[in-house]
Amino acid sequence: MSNVSPNSMNLNGSTSSTASVNDSGGGGGGGNVTSPTLSSSSASSISNSNSSSSNNLKPSTQPLSSSSTLNTPTQFSLQHSSSSSSLNNTNIDIIEHITISYQDESSIWKYIEAELPNHLPLKNISWKTKTGHTKVVEKMPIEILQYNDERVKAHYDNQNLYKKPYLYLYLVHCDDPDTYKNVVRAKIKQWVTQMTERQQEWLIVYVSLGPKRFSELTSKLTRTVFDRIKNDFNVKRDRCCQLRFLDTNNTSSGNNKDKDNDNGGGSSGTGLSTSTKQQDDLWDDFLIKMKEGIISSAEQYLTTYEDEIRKMDAKRTTPGWSYQNFFFIKEGLALIYERAQLYEDALMQYFELEVLFGDPNNRSQFDQITDEVLQPNSIHCNGNILDTSFKNYRKLIYENKISLFDFKVYLFARQSKLLFLLQKPIEAATKSISFITSMSMIIKQYPNSFAPMFKESWIFSTSMELIKACQDSFDKIVNGAQQQQQQQQQQLQLQQQLQQQQQQQTINGSAQKVVKSISSTTPISKLFGAFGPFGSSSSNTPSSTSATTAANGKNTPMPSNSGIASLSAGGSTIIAGLSGSQSLNNLQSAQLSGALNTQHYIRTPSLNLTSDLSERLTEKQDRESLDFLVGDLLFSSAQRLEELAIIIGYLPVDDYNSEMFFQNVEEVIFKSVENKKIEVDSMTAFSYQPLQVSLQSSKQFTQLYFELLGQIEKLYIQSNRMRSISRLTFAIANLNFKLKEFQIAENLFKSISNLYSREHWSYIEYAVKTRLSYCQKQLGHLVDYVTTCVGLLAPGLLTNRFEKDHYLSEIIQISRKPELNIVQPMIPLFKCKVTFKETVYRYFETIKINVRIKSNLISPIRFNNGAVSFVKSGFGDKLVFQLNDFLVEPGVNNFQFTAVGTTKATFVKDSIWLKIDNLSFGYSLRNADTAIGGGGGGTNTTTTTLPGEIKVIDSESQITLESFANSPLLFYSIQYVGIKLHTHSDTIEAGVLTFTSPTGATIIPTSSVIIIQSDDKTCETSSRTINLINDKLPLSQIGYNQTLEFYLPLMAVNTDTCTHQIRIELQHQKQTKEKFSSSLVSSILFINPLTIDESVINVNNRLFLKTIIQCNSPNMIQFNSYSLEGCDSEYQSPEQQQLQQQLQQQQQLSLSSSSSSISSISSKSSQQPNLYYLVKDHNHSLAPNLNLYPGQLVSLIFEIKKYENESLSSSTSPSSATDSSNSNGNNNNNNNNNNHSKNDLKLKIKYTSKMPQQDLDRPLIRECKSLWRDQNEFSWPIKIELPTYLYQIDLSIQSRAYVGTIVLFEIEITNLKQQQQQQKESNNDNGNEKQQKQQQLQYHIVADSQIWMISGKSKHTFSFNSDTVGEKLKFSCGLIPISSGSLPIPKVTLVGINNSNISYPKTKNEKIFVYPSPQIYSCHQLQDNNNNNNNSINSQTSTNKT
């Protein structure tokens, strides 16, 4: 093996010397590298591999402002003072990649080294994990180390498995087959055996120098050395590849290194020669096999770690489980992911470890909090929070010797590095805030482990460095997007130029020029500059400059990649490095106080980027989010800086929780600084250079502090965080307050004085208002001072009684100054509510309202005057209620304010005022929820008021009328309607009530009315009798709030349910001699007390009248008696009927002319004789005086019968038959003749209406009882519809017979009506109006086939003579019984005739007794008997027909 000068090449092809590279795991310095390396960890490689992830950001069109210093008279650097951070790259700047080891015993590495960068980084590497997920890396830089490099070890365990090379290359060059056979093959075999034992992926690379030999080109039988190698070592997989150099026929070695190829992608175009294509194929084969080996090793390493993690995780609940050991193994998996550029997977491992760290059992495994008591000048406070190179953290974790503080710092640094690599500065800033918060809690929890001022200096330095890192990362993302867009535009231009050149030049020439043009493009990474989380520019990577520095051992100062660049002495800007989302050096800001007093903040656009109008929405949102987080970090830094100033003595102590501020404020401002000031050498007390400079004097601190607050303000304004601006305003105002700049402090405090009161943050509100009040008192702003004192006396703000008394006495003293006129809102000291019962008052009437005042003070206070104003709708007059000289006690106070209504109008609540000397407390009542009462109604007009209104009236009547009744009322009985008269706020000097019924109800006249009079206020009741004059009720001398109640008797005699109207009219005169008239129309429902449903049931020519009676009365009634009129109580002969009719006529003549109309109607209806007589009353079981309640039913059943002579006359007389027919024909109509039909009956019921007992006990009811008729009568008409018989069928049969013998069955059919009338009433010929002289009829014998056999016709057609009434036709047939016993005779019907129109008189024999045969006959004898019977029947039938 030849000694080759160690070189290191980045992926862009630049060659440089090696540089010191630290362990990516944070271990101690890795030392100088003496072996040749091919480093892929430069900033350019990172940017090339990650630039695609920043495409979502819109590039800026303006360059970034990168000035790091200010042009000020006094200027000093805020870089790190630590030499380690100045000489070495921080661990976050160094990115480890996958390594490949090679062994070169033929001294051919120099050829590969020159060409290999043109084919890197590797692209599109993917593999599948055991979970089935596919890991894909688009671009993977690699680092190639020589086999004897100190970083390449012989054996690797779980501690450093992630450092193990992923592929071992064996480079061989041999042209002589014998030499290969005798020497080289054995060496290769030994090397392969060694790799196999280590389970390591390996690859043999055969390098050919010079062009192909003539034998290789002409003979295919000759085996080359490469063919022998493949034959010897390609056993299971092709692990051999070939490269060729120094081929004069191949020009790709010189030009192809500028080619932008894709690994394994084939040739680059059609313009290349055949030898060039073959050379590209060799390189593609080499790269493909290299990627296969890397993938295989990565899967092997991942499997090893995952299996180990799975085993340890399963034992997590067992005693003795070590969290640090588990962390060490799991971090190894994360480091593998990181080297493979799978940053999200690596970050997930750390997040899971952080979650496990939250378990108290795991956290308790850390034996010590810190290695030693940490001082503010220690290395931890010099701003190197992201640098893990100065301490071997992994070794400490492996040995379980790491402290809790170091572990938290290391875990955060690793997470931050991955977040920056993922280009997530916003998430990194969020993580930074939570990390600083948790670390401050640890420092506070273990104060013995940390020296004074360590917490403040550590938080300040850490926050400042994290701010710079986050903003640099964001700037790099934005610039990367901008550079990528520019590069795309350049490529587009080159393509256009190529098309133009192809038209003028040859294909080969044009292709070669295109390659040269592309290769001359500046890499994107070189445009980024120095970035902390991504590494720096080429000077910070393993480049020639850094390598020379490391080789010579000289500590040459280098620009820090993080930290604050400079501090301005002039006060314009403090942090030149805060340029992530805005260029703080170039911002043009107004004065601080003026900006903070502006209510509507205007976001300042970033001058270092394009205008916000041209930025995409996503970038603007990310920019605002980062500005807000950076602002919070910077504000935290400013607070820690202030705490350091307080400790040193530059500022007084800020105790927000101290009570009695008005007593302690003098001591805080004027005495605390002189008493507590200590001598501190900031250069030795702190290791962070900004703190060393800024804390040298009070002036430098003030300058730094105000500039920090100015930058915070701009960040908050640009991120639109108004609440944070308010918090910042308080910090600035408080600092001016301590510096006795009361005018500035007042303006700032006043701008946020009401913000925290609305959100009930009493802690902050107390601090704001106490300081504001002191400033106002010192400046002599007494009116504003009273306002602030009122705010301090709000409930829940002051807890000390002495403070409350102090500020209250201040208010009272200032109110006595005659030159002042102070107006304050009533809330929060007082709450008022105005109520009043009445809303309508008379002209010049005294009006009283109730005012409830709730005082939130702890002491009583006396007011000179109180006023409640009501204003007229629109504008003009006022109604003012007043109360003078009253004392308001703490809590609820009730007062009564009075006023006189001197203006007739409607007044609305306006305001309430409470006055102490020259101080007035006011409150608007326009939208207050005021309870009101009262209200009323007039006689002619209706007075309505809205809530909070008072109406003063003069000429409107408030009297109202009201009627009531136990609706519904009943017909045919005296009923009573109650009437109420309410005077309300009105009076009646004289008046009269008149009663009428527009609908015809009878108002029963009476001589006097009993009136019950009651007072609505005193509830006193009295009764008196008032005599009616001409049916009118006079009224006189009725005062305010009186109610008159009386009952009006009336009766209605309608037959159906109806509504009657009662009109009550009042005419009255007031004391003012004004006359008014009002009326009330009341609608009252009248119903029948009973509802009767009747039905006539015909059972075997017997008529039963069934009535169902239902009680409709709202009250219980007593069923006394009943009678059935229009029906004789018993059968009467015609002579008796004629005699009774004569007696009735004589009685009618003897009646006087003054008889009631009801008796006349009943007399007229009784002149005609009754058609029916009562056979039997089946209701004897009904109890006397039966009580019926509403809804109850009772049933009455009567058996009646119609006189035969009437039936006969109706059937024989043509006129009566026609009337009966018309009555039957209009069966479905109720509009019969006006005269009562002879078929009508009337059910008369006597009942007693019972009122409820509670009504009977009332005095007014008892007085009216004399007019009440106890027993009432109720009549209900009943119409009996009897069927009209058209035909009569008589059946005749002998009473007994024997089974099997023929029985003579005779049928006689009688015509009862004329044939023309039959056609109108029968259902057989509806609608046939044609006159016919004969009607064809057909009878049908319906016999049970199980009992009878019919001998003859079961159906027969016949006809009657049309002019004959009472005509009879006889028919007969033979019936043969086939069953013995009492058998029913068959039924005979007429086809087409309704059975209800056929009369079946009661036959003599409805049944026939059939006996078994008494003799036993032979067949011949039985046949002879049947023939004889048939002959006799036939002869009888022929006789009937004749």
From Swiss-Prot:
UniProt keyword list: ER-Golgi transport, Golgi apparatus, Transport
One BP annotation, GO: early endosome to Golgi transport
Region (Disordered): 1-86, 251-277, 535-564, 1208-1238, 1316-1335, 1422-1442
GO CC field: cytosol; TRAPPII protein complex
Biased composition regions of type Polar residues, renumbered to the chain: 1-23, 554-564
Low complexity biased stretches: 39-86, 535-553, 1208-1236, 1425-1442
One Pfam family named in its UniProt record: TRAPPC10
Entry's localization field: Golgi apparatus, cis-Golgi network
Family designation: Belongs to the TMEM1 family.
Subunit and interaction comment: Part of the multisubunit TRAPP (transport protein particle) complex.
PANTHER family per record: EPILEPSY HOLOPROSENCEPHALY CANDIDATE 1/TMEM1 (PTHR13251), TRAFFICKING PROTEIN PARTICLE COMPLEX SUBUNIT 10 (PTHR13251:SF3)
Function of the protein: May play a role in vesicular transport from endoplasmic reticulum to Golgi.
Protein name: Trafficking protein particle complex subunit 10
Species, as recorded: Dictyostelium discoideum (Social amoeba)
